[in-house]
């Protein structure tokens, strides 16, 4: 039997060579490989193939290895590739990406992907599946951020804070062992993975070690607490010993030293630099130079991406609020103006496009929007395609660019903070934190958000309706968000030192606990598809940015895709 590509796609989803548009962007991904078998596709429903004795094996039990969940015929968009496959989940983890079914009557079935009577099905035909996002720049200012982030497709939040305290509104630090314990306890209620950064600003190691042993997955150096060369050196010594990450927000006003002094204090040790663009903070005007160094893992935040006609005006007011500045104090106003530079903000988009900035993150409620990491990452990708054209290696599709940009908020932040053994990609063995998208709504409104293999958020209609689809349809909490299910489907990340000291047990934590690890030997070359090391120079008078001698400049846009048209209802 033969059928047209159009007919096949309508029934079973796109196959090798077919293209899918991402939302209302100008980005098109092309299926590189199809792991399903033509004629033996797994389809659920009346008269379909997932029935007893057909695609469903009638003998295999859960103990024998039957899948708990299969997502059928879905297109995976991951840094590893853009492929069509079935995705198998067992005990909350991904056990296979390939062909599912009943090996008794079918060829090519992955032995780890056998469908049995205990297997649930999510139909992925015509849908896109991605890994849950990892946001590494969270100010834990209000718990409602968790709901917004999860509803956007972000499933892991890393950062610091204790609520709307003045320090937390400005810096991503959960300061001290007592607050670390309380935040670990609070995290029990949320169906999302979390990890907390302690305050890294101290000239002695003891208060830093205390926070690491209390559970901190890393330390945060922030200029508002004094990011001096002494504090940097002390912090770096502690994280090297504990195999955790340090995130740094450098000295905007160059009070305790210049960029070169910070580099000397860091040495050749790996560090995650926040706000590489500078608008969010850091050595003015040349913090962006750090993206040239192999031991620097650079990220930027949602406020400045993509560069639009409104970016400059919006930032000045935000700056005054977020950093507790006074518009009546001339020095505070000058501080704000020193950070908002059009030339470096414009260069930020291009550095993302060439893979020199490795990660995107939110800076939640502290200049950034926690629910817009994914939206804004894809808006930059769209803007760069329109302004810079296709990337090398692309032939009639945007696969190279798509894989580069999805890596910025999935695998690369997971690697940077030592979580990639658990999350960050759609790969065998990882927690099944997965996001299912209708291509029309890609990047904006997920259809389903799975945590540890269970649906935590979904687009759902009127609960009193006779079917799930009647209006109003919007993102609602699902069963993985309730009771003890949120504890068994999510992870609290902690330092190895705190785990060995029994902190989780002493606090009575019930969530899965996992250590961060394999951090201190990282380099930028470990950043997937975002490891470029151009020589970056910045004119101190005009703030023009040059990479390998080429000026990086682009125009602000007055329209972005994935924008207001999606939020009319």
UniProtKB/Swiss-Prot annotation:
Q: In which pathway does it act?
A: Nitrogen metabolism; urea degradation; CO(2) and NH(3) from urea (urease route): step 1/1
GO CC terms: cytoplasm
N6-carboxylysine (modified residue): where? 220
Give the quaternary structure: Heterotrimer of UreA (gamma), UreB (beta) and UreC (alpha) subunits. Three heterotrimers associate to form the active enzyme.
Q: What is its main location?
A: cytoplasm
Keyword set for this entry?
Answer: Cytoplasm, Hydrolase, Metal-binding, Nickel
- Gene name in the database record: ureC
Pfam families of this UniProt entry? Amidohydro_1, Urease_alpha
Stored CDD domains = Urease_alpha
Q: What class of enzyme is it?
A: hydrolase
Known catalytic reactions: urea + 2 H2O + H(+) = hydrogencarbonate + 2 NH4(+)
Any idea which positions bind substrate?
222
Family under the similarity heading: Belongs to the metallo-dependent hydrolases superfamily. Urease alpha subunit family.
**What does the record list as GO biological process?**
urea catabolic process
Q: Which residues are noted in the entry as Ni(2+) 1-binding?
A: 137, 139, 220, 363
Locate the residues binding Ni(2+) 2. 220, 249, 275
In short, the EC number is 3.5.1.5
The protein's PTM annotation reads: Carboxylation allows a single lysine to coordinate two nickel ions.
Enumerate the spans annotated as Urease domain.
Answer: 132-569
Q: Where in the cell?
A: Cytoplasm
Q: What is this protein called?
A: Urease subunit alpha
GO molecular-function annotation terms? nickel cation binding; urease activity
List the active site.
Answer: 323
Q: Name the cofactor(s).
A: Ni cation
> What does this protein's record comment on cofactor binding?
Binds 2 nickel ions per subunit.
């Amino acid at each position: 039997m033969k059928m047209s590509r159009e007919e096949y796609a309508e029934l079973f989803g796109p196959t090798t060579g077919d293209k899918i548009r991402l939302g209302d962007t100008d980005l098109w991904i092309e299926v590189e490989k199809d792991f399903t078998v033509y004629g033996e596709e797994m389809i659920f429903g009346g008269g379909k193939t997932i029935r007893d004795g057909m695609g469903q094996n009638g003998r295999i039990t859960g103990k024998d290895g039957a899948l708990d969940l299969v997502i059928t015929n879905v297109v995976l968009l991951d840094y590893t590739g853009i492929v069509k496959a079935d995705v198998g989940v067992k005990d909350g983890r991904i056990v296979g990406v390939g062909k599912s079914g009943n090996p008794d009557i079918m060829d090519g079935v992955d032995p780890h992907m056998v469908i049995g009577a205990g297997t649930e099905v999510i139909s992925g035909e015509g849908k896109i599946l991605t890994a849950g996002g990892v946001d590494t720049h969270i100010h834990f200012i209000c718990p409602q951020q968790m709901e917004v982030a999860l509803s956007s497709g972000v499933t892991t939040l890393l950062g610091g804070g204790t609520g709307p305290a003045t320090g937390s509104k400005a810096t991503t630090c959960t300061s001290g062992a007592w607050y670390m314990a309380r935040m670990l306890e609070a995290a029990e209620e949320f169906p999302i993975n979390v990890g907390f950064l302690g305050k890294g600003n101290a000239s002695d190691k003891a208060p830093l070690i205390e926070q690491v042993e209390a559970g901190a997955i890393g330390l945060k150096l922030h200029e508002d607490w004094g990011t001096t060369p002494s504090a940097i050196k002390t912090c770096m010594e502690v994280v090297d010993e504990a195999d955790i990450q340090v995130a740094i927000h450098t000295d905007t006003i160059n009070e305790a030293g210049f960029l070169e002094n910070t580099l000397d204090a860091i040495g050749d040790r790996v560090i995650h630099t926040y706000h590489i663009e500078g608008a969010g903070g850091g050595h003015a005007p040349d913090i962006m130079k750090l993206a040239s160094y192999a031991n620097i893992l650079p990220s930027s935040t949602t406020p400045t991406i993509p560069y639009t006609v409104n970016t400059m005006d919006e930032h000045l007011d935000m700056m005054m609020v977020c950093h507790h500045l006074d518009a009546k104090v001339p020095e505070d106003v000058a501080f704000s103006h020193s950070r908002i530079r059009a030339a470096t903000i414009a260069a930020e988009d291009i550095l993302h496009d060439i893979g020199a900035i490795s990660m995107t993150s939110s800076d939640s409620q502290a200049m950034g929007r926690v629910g817009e990491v994914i939206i804004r990452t894809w808006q930059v990708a769209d803007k760069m395609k329109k302004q810079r054209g296709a990337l090398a290696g692309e032939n009639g599709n945007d696969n190279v660019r798509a894989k580069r940009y999805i890596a910025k908020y999935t695998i690369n932040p997971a690697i940077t903070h030592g979580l990639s053994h658990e999350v960050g990609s759609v790969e065998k063995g990882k927690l099944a934190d997965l996001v299912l998208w209708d291509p029309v709504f890609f990047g904006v409104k997920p259809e389903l958000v799975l945590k540890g293999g269970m649906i935590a958020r979904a687009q759902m209609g009127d609960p009193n309706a006779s079917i799930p689809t009647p209006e109003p349809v919007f993102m609602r909490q699902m069963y993985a968000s309730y009771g003890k299910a949120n504890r068994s489907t999510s992870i609290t990340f902690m330092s190895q030192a705190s785990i060995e000291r029994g902190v989780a047990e002493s606090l009575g934590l019930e969530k899965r606990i996992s250590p961060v690890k394999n951090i201190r030997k990282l380099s930028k070359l470990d950043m997937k598809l975002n490891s470029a090391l151009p020589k970056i120079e910045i004119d101190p008078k005009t703030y023009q940015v040059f990479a390998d001698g080429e000026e990086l400049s682009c125009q602000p846009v007055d329209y972005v895709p994935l924008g207001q048209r999606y939020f009319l209802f």
